[in-house]
């Protein structure tokens, strides 16, 4: 600014003076009273006129308490220096309030990725790592924990801003098929919290209703479920003491589903062969790193590779009695077993659940537990002598028809270990909220609610009956050898095996529970309930987070061809060795 000297009549003039405001040096305009004969240094006349005009319009105001102590007083609408805000998570310079907390761009992006991709992390320390700017990437588990503790909300992660490729794959909805149940253990409260869903109004990004014929997902992605969970144990479940790899069997199921999809898409897709590591990378969508547990995953995929490479020739050596039946012969000699339908080792059904339960239990934990139960049920069925005398095609048909019934019996047997009641209660709460917010149609909610009620009623009844391991084994055998499913070959042989199982169960009840005369009939009367449960809804509740719209019965042939030794080895390795979550 040009400076001039003035010796005119007294006027109001201004000058620039540096003062301290909030520990910062700021240049301010100071009003100076002049008098005749006094020479002062002032700003140019044009600037002074503009300042006087602003003052007259009451836009600026100055006070002078002496030349050395002048201070500026601005109106509320005026811009004033702002203190620098720090990220509540790592202490870096904050860029604003994101998802409910003052945070930097780094923590904002980290939280968004973690919620959108449903990533789970593990802490290599004591879950109390210090999170600062320079080491915030060292422990993602503690960083995510601190994000939540500082007030970041997962339901604020907007679905409509998700990557374009994700939106293209799931038109009209954010969820591929089912809500990502993301369970959080509230470490601040010593009490068990009621399982509740945080509604996904922000996540939905539109109406969740879909036309009939499309399998509509039940929930939105990234929804948090507040649950204080304590480790549970059950006689029917074996729980490991170390953090197991939650990706192994779930990844196998996903890989089978993806492989089946590629086969259906055409030769150009199905002819491409992926190694186990490449397959895992495809499952992870190229952006989820597997930290540790590589040996466990490789062993599981080795078993998968053997199953996929098994040719029809390997099945020719099976003791099959179906070929003659399919050849048109109406008189087929039935096979008689020299031993009972079940032996002592068939009574054992030990499900190894992922343990310990992490503080942040995402959908992979639930799907992994369900995958293990599915594998265990199928390989248990394969071990039955009566099952082994049938052909491979009959194996596939039988299991495809009744996999949901076998799975439900397994859920009832391992309900405590899987915390089934907690999961179902949370889903019911969310369905009620979705109905109130018009996110799901009333018919859709009614169908799922009825399914859950039937499932819970079945589990509760078996619990009240105190069904033991042997009784569960015989009930599964009776369900497996059901001759009334359409499309089965050699129905007479299957019916014969079912009659043997019923007879052996009757003898067991008479010997073990002689005073409970109605126990045998009560057990058999529970089986019709299994036919009322929808396999499609069962897939959606427990598997859709893994395989989307692929049906379980499409991957059953691959699972049945897996070698039992490989499956058992993968299970043992996962139980004995610590692993990590996909994240």
Curated annotation (Swiss-Prot):
GO CC annotation, single: apical part of cell
Residues in the DNA-binding region annotation: 84-159
Keyword Magnesium: no
Domain NR LBD as annotated: residue spans: 248-563
InterPro entries: NHR-like_dom_sf, NR2C1/2-like_DBD, NR2C1/2-like_LBD, Nucl_hrmn_rcpt_lig-bd, Nuclear_hormone_rcpt_NR2, Nuclear_hrmn_rcpt, Znf_hrmn_rcpt, Znf_NHR/GATA
Tissue: Expressed uniformly in the early embryo. In contrast, larval expression is localized to the epaulettes and mouth epithelium. Expressed in multiple adult organs including lantern muscle, tubefeet, intestine, coelomocytes and gonads. In the adult ovaries and testes, expression is specifically localized to the smooth muscle epithelial layer of cells which surround the ovarioles and acini, respectively (at protein level).
Keyword set includes Transcription: yes
Compartment(s) of residence: Cytoplasm; Nucleus
Keyword line: Cytoplasm, DNA-binding, Metal-binding, Nucleus, Receptor, Transcription, Transcription regulation, Zinc, Zinc-finger
One Gene Ontology term from the biological process aspect of the record: cell differentiation
Superkingdom of origin: Eukaryota
One function term, GO molecular function aspect: nuclear receptor activity
UniProt zinc finger (NR C4-type) residues: 87-107, 123-142
Assembly behavior: Binds DNA as a monomer.
Function as written in the Swiss-Prot or TrEMBL entry: Orphan nuclear receptor. Binds to the hormone response element in the upstream promoter region of the CYIIIB gene in vitro. Both isoform 1 and isoform 2 bind DNA.
Homology family: Belongs to the nuclear hormone receptor family. NR2 subfamily.
Name by which UniProt lists this protein: Orphan steroid hormone receptor 2
Organism, scientific name: Strongylocentrotus purpuratus (Purple sea urchin)
């Amino acid at each position: 600014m040009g400076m001039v000297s003035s010796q005119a009549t007294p006027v109001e003039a201004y000058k620039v003076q540096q003062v301290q405001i909030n520990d910062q040096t700021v240049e301010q305009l100071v009003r100076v009273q002049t008098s005749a004969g006094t020479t002062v240094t002032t700003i140019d006349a044009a600037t002074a006129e503009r300042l006087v005009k602003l003052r007259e319009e009451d836009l600026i105001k100055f006070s002078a308490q002496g030349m050395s102590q002048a201070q500026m007083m601005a109106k509320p609408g005026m811009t004033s220096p702002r203190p620098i805000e720090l990220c509540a998570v790592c202490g870096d310079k904050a860029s604003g309030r994101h998802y409910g907390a003052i945070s930097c761009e780094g923590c904002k992006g980290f939280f968004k990725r973690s919620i959108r991709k449903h990533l789970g992390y593990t802490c290599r320390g004591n879950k109390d790592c210090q999170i600062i700017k320079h080491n915030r990437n060292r422990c993602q588990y503690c960083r995510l924990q601190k994000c939540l503790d500082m007030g970041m909300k997962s339901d604020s992660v907007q679905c409509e801003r998700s990557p374009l490729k994700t939106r293209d794959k799931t038109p009209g909805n954010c969820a591929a098929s089912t809500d990502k149940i993301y369970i959080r253990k509230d470490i601040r409260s010593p009490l068990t919290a009621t399982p509740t869903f945080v509604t996904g109004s922000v996540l939905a990004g539109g109406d969740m209703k879909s036309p009939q014929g499309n399998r509509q997902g039940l929930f939105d992605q990234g929804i948090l479920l507040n649950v204080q969970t304590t480790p549970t144990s059950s006689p029917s479940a074996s729980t490991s003491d170390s953090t197991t790899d939650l990706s192994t069997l779930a990844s196998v199921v996903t890989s089978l589903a993806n492989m089946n999809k590629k086969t259906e898409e055409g030769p150009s897709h199905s002819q491409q062969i992926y190694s186990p590591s490449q397959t895992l990378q495809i499952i992870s969508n190229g952006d989820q790193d597997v930290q540790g547990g590589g040996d466990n995953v490789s062993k599981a995929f080795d078993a998968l590779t053997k199953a996929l490479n098994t040719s029809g020739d390997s099945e020719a050596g099976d003791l099959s009695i179906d070929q003659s039946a399919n050849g048109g012969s109406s008189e087929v000699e039935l096979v008689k077993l020299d031993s009972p339908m079940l032996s002592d080792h068939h009574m054992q059904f030990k499900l190894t659940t992922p343990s310990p339960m992490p503080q942040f239990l995402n959908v992979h934990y639930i799907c992994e537990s369900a995958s293990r139960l599915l594998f265990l049920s199928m390989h248990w069925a394969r071990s039955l002598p009566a099952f082994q005398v049938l052909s491979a095609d009959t194996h596939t048909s039988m299991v495809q028809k009744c996999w949901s019934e076998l799975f439900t019996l397994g859920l009832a047997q391992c309900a405590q270990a899987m915390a089934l009641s907690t999961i179902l209660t949370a889903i019911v709460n969310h369905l009620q909220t979705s109905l109130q917010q018009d996110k799901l149609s009333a018919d859709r909610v009614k169908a799922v609610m009825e399914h859950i009620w039937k499932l819970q009623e079945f589990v509760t009844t078996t619990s009240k009956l105190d069904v033991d391991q042997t009784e569960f084994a015989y009930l599964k055998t009776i369900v497996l050898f059901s001759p009334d499913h359409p499309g089965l070959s050699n129905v007479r042989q299957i019916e014969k095996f079912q009659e043997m199982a019923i007879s052996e169960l009757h003898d067991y009840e008479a010997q073990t529970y002689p005073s409970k005369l109605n126990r045998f009939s009560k057990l058999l009367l529970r089986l019709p309930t299994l036919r009322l449960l929808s396999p499609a809804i069962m897939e959606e509740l427990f598997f859709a987070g893994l395989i989307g719209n692929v049906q379980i019965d499409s991957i059953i042939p691959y699972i049945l061809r897996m070698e039992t030794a490989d499956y058992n080895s993968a299970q043992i390795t996962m139980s004995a060795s610590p692993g990590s979550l996909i994240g």
